[in-house]
């Protein structure tokens, strides 16, 4: 498998995790958030959120900066991620319309 296809499939796998997907959507709506803010918003433990953030970091979906006291996470490529989320939304709507 070529590198580009592999990376695309890896991104699909990451976003296939409902917690990761919710976190990415949340970060798309906010400039930057701490793990505790993300955990509160998605209803998961900080430990679980931190684990998922690590996977999203490895997948180059998110990045973080430290302000001394805490890490703040943001999307690495916000406009591209928002485009993917928008395309997924349109696909789901189209697929739902076909079933009817």
Task: Report the location of each language-model feature.
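Amphipathic alpha-helical dimerization/coiled-coil segments
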Residues: 1-8, 29, 76-100
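N-terminal helix-turn-helix DNA-binding core of bacterial DNA-binding proteins
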Residues: 6-48, 69-80
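Beta-hairpin "wing" of winged helix-turn-helix
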Residues: 57-68, 74
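Short, hydrophobic-biased segments on the C-terminal half of alpha helices
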Residues: 24, 53-54
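Intrinsic structural disorder/low-complexity segments
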Residues: 50-51, 93
């Amino acid at each position: 498998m070529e590198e580009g296809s592999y990376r695309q499939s890896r991104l699909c796998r990451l976003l296939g995790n409902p917690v990761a997907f919710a976190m990415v959507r949340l970060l798309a709506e906010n400039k930057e958030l701490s793990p505790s803010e993300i955990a509160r918003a998605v209803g998961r433990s900080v430990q679980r959120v931190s684990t998922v953030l690590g996977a999203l970091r490895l997948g180059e979906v998110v990045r973080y900066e430290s302000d001394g006291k805490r890490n703040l996470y943001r999307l690495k490529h916000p406009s591209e991620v928002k485009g993917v989320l928008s395309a997924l939304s349109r696909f789901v709507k189209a697929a739902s319309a076909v079933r009817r």
